[in-house]
């Protein structure tokens, strides 16, 4: 698919080189510190990018597996964070090569809003599979108010899903979208927030989800 190749090329151009001392965490995960502290299973950081969240989990003493579709991102993770259990390069559309019920936490920070609806549900099913019963998924996704980062721009392929000028897919969520896509989890927290990691203000939905225990 052209979108997959375009996405890979784009992110490899972004994740060129990082130095650990310049990698910063922001405070969005602090809300979940009690959950993080009590987590005994490994943590999966999907779409790890430069390693902002990987760093946060490492500093909390967690066993982290970091993943990204960009080989440059993974090379930087391996260079900057030798503490990680593993750093794996794969596209989420290919599925997740992990055992069932393996992770206590999955972190998807700005990495789940690049897919068509059917693919998004497939990825979320994979995340539920690899989470332990009662495990947690921490998410941030684009808001429909995220105009500084392309909200409403490009060709609309599905409601709130756009094909951008560089040939990538980009989805923007309202609260109804957020609750619909994540309805197979228990939604513990869902709030529209502003984040300031980048040069311009970004608007996101921050969501805390819990995998349901069967039976």
Residue ranges and their predicted role:
Residues 97-99, 116, 174:
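GHKL-family ATP-binding catalytic core of two-component histidine kinases
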Residues 112, 134-136:
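Intrinsic-disorder/low-complexity, polar/charged segments enriched in Ser/Thr/Lys/Arg/Asp/Glu/Gln
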Residues 46:
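Conserved beta-strand/loop positions that form the S-adenosyl-L-methionine
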Residues 104-119:
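A short SAM/SAH-binding and catalytic strip from SAM-dependent methyltransferases
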Residues 96-106:
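A short acidic, Gly/Pro-enriched loop at the edge of an enzyme's catalytic core
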Residues 121-133:
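A short glycine-rich, Lys/Arg-flanked "PGG" loop and its adjoining helix->strand segment in the class I
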Residues 1-40, 49-85, 89-95, 138-215:
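Class I (Rossmann-like) S-adenosyl-L-methionine-dependent methyltransferase catalytic domain
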């Amino acid at each position: 698919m052209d979108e997959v190749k375009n996405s890979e090329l784009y992110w490899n151009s972004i994740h060129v080189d990082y130095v650990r001392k310049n990698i910063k965490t922001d405070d969005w995960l602090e809300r979940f510190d009690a959950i993080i502290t009590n987590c005994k299973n490994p943590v999966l950081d999907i779409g790890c990018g430069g390693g902002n969240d990987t760093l946060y989990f490492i500093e909390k003493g967690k066993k982290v597996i970091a993943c990204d579709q960009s080989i440059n991102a993974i090379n930087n993770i391996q260079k900057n964070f030798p503490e990680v259990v593993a750093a794996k390069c794969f596209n989420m559309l290919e599925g997740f090569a992990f055992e069932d019920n393996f992770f206590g936490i999955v972190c998807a920070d700005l990495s789940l809003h690049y897919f068509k609806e059917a693919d998004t549900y497939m990825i979320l099913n994979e995340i539920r599979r690899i989470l332990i019963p009662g495990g947690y998924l921490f998410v941030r996704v684009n808001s429909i108010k995220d105009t500084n980062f392309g909200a409403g721009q490009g060709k609309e392929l599905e409601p709130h899903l756009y094909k951008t000028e560089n040939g990538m897919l980009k989805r923007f969520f309202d609260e109804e979208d957020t609750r619909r896509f994540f309805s197979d989890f228990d939604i513990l927290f869902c709030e529209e927030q502003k984040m300031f990691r980048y040069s311009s203000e970004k608007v996101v939905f921050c969501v805390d989800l819990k995998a349901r225990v069967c039976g």
